[in-house]
């Protein structure tokens, strides 16, 4: 069953808020901007992550140095799952952020 538009937006908003909290709680100098539903995270080394919502597809998209990734929400596991690798968003972010920022983050629950 497909997500309703309202549920989709609620889930993306909740996910972006969790991401902001995780990055805010770090000791790193990270700049974040959330504008029109797009969350941009800029690391000290100039690399960035961009999280955007694709409403028609009901997907959360992630742009990173290593590429672009599309996530569908899995109601059963209550997690965003990559539509290609089936990796959970949190697991993928732990790997990507370590590659880009050179530090480890805990994205448990995403």
Curated annotation (Swiss-Prot):
Database matches in SMART domains: Frataxin_Cyay
One Gene Ontology biological process: iron-sulfur cluster assembly
Pfam family, one: Frataxin_Cyay
Domain of life (superkingdom): Bacteria
Keyword Iron: yes
Alphabetic keyword roster: Iron, Metal-binding
GO terms for cellular component: cytosol
GO molecular function, one term: ferric iron binding
InterPro entries from the UniProt entry: CyaY, Frataxin/CyaY, Frataxin/CyaY_sf, Frataxin_CS
Keyword Transmembrane listed: no
Biological role stated in the UniProt entry: Involved in iron-sulfur (Fe-S) cluster assembly. May act as a regulator of Fe-S biogenesis.
Family: Belongs to the frataxin family.
Protein's name in the database: Iron-sulfur cluster assembly protein CyaY
Protein encoded by which gene: cyaY
